[in-house]
Curated annotation (Swiss-Prot):
Main localization, broad class: cytoplasm
Family in the record: Belongs to the RNase HII family. RnhC subfamily.
Gene Ontology CC entries for this record: cytoplasm; ribonuclease H2 complex
Manner of cofactor binding, per the entry note: Manganese or magnesium. Binds 1 divalent metal ion per monomer in the absence of substrate. May bind a second metal ion after substrate binding.
Catalytic activity: Endonucleolytic cleavage to 5'-phosphomonoester
Cofactor: Mn(2+); Mg(2+)
InterPro entries listed in its UniProt record: RNase_HII/HIII, RNase_HII/HIII_dom, RNase_HIII, RNase_HIII_N, RNaseH-like_sf, RNaseH_sf, TBP_dom_sf
GO terms, molecular function: magnesium ion binding; RNA binding; RNA-DNA hybrid ribonuclease activity
NCBIfam families cross-referenced by the UniProt entry: rnhC
E.C. number: 3.1.26.4
Subcellular location as annotated: Cytoplasm
Protein name: Ribonuclease HIII
Domain RNase H type-2: 95-312
Length: 312
């Protein structure tokens, strides 16, 4: 008999959940629903009323990932994602800023990488000269070329959460949003210690969730950075520190990804599309399902799809 658990939460958390489960979203949405997602042994259905239902063998485990966050009081005023007290000042683009960004969260294969970079205001013209901009607009060769120069120009802190550890932490009830928050905070803390006694005029985090949710994720951490911290979506266009962090995070991710392909003995594809399902099925045949957590983010829907391909 399958379990069924219902939690009441805010629209902000439901949006965060939809983002976290984006690889597992179902085209079927029940009446009054916002989304339905299917992950291994659990179906998640979120409703406009704020209720979220978890059904299946892993209902309790999946619901527990969201229960502390779900205690956030519901906002009576609908706000835009960038409408909060942590919005950066309009002059931030010319300030000395510590910026952080992450890469690899939407890729089934490969780790999650987070990098924090400090850019002194005097270095902004140099970074522009080097071609620093959003890494999504650069190919891997351009990323490598710019990153190799950046490594000698800006102070940085780079963290890699490898797949085995990622899956272990996820199974302990840490959703992807929380893992990102922990890594951003750690990278920022590491870099502040590295550049001391220099203090940035501000810290800009490329926003992946509402700031209040970010700080809830960090509730049990001893060191949490709160002073002059700003959040903005598309942070790489707000300050070059985030753009530089994005480039170094991508550079690190690509290097780790190449190593993982060597370990797998086959070229692993990026992303989470159909070609990834096929590659995952081949990898399971090659190394066995027991070793899959060394290469992938197991909770992605691709895992179930790969096993379905093997049954055909």
């Amino acid at each position: 008999m399958s379990n069924s658990i219902v939690i009441q939460t805010s629209s902000t958390v439901i949006e965060d959940m939809k983002q976290q489960y984006k690889q597992a979203l179902s085209p079927k949405i029940p009446q009054g629903g916002i989304f339905m997602a299917k992950v291994p042994s659990c179906t998640i259905t979120a409703y406009k009323s704020g209720k979220v239902m978890f059904q299946g063998g892993r209902a309790e485990a999946e619901a527990s990932r969201w229960q502390t966050v779900s205690q956030t009081p519901k906002s009576t005023v609908k706000k835009s994602v960038n409408s909060h007290q942590y919005a950066p000042p309009s002059s931030i683009g010319t300030m000395s800023i510590l910026g952080s960004d992450e890469v690899g969260t939407g890729d089934y294969f490969g780790p999650m990488t987070v990098v924090a970079v400090y850019v002194d205001a005097k270095q902004i013209p140099l970074l522009k000269e080097l071609g620093v901009k959003d890494s999504k607009n650069l190919n891997d060769a351009q990323i490598a070329e710019i990153a190799k120069q950046l490594l000698h120009v800006v102070p940085y802190s780079s963290l890699v959460l490898h797949n085995e550890k990622y899956n272990e932490l996820f199974d302990k009830g840490n959703n992807q949003g929380k893992l990102k928050a922990l890594l951003h905070n750690k990278a920022i803390t590491n870099l502040l210690a590295k550049i001391a006694p220099t203090k940035p005029e501000g810290i800009l985090i490329d926003q992946f969730t509402q700031p209040d949710t970010y700080y809830k994720y960090l509730a049990k951490q001893k060191q949490v950075q709160r002073e002059n911290v700003y959040f903005a979506t598309k942070g790489e266009s707000v300050h070059l520190a985030v753009a530089a962090a994005s480039i170094l995070a991508r550079y690190s991710f690509v290097k780790q990804f190449d190593e993982l392909s060597k370990k797998a003995g086959m070229q692993l594809p990026k992303g989470a599309g159909k070609q990834v399902d096929i590659a995952a099925a081949k990898l399971i045949q090659k190394v066995g399902k027991e070793r899959l957590p060394e290469f992938v983010k197991v909770h992605f829907a691709n895992t179930e799809k790969a096993f379905r391909l093997l049954k055909k």
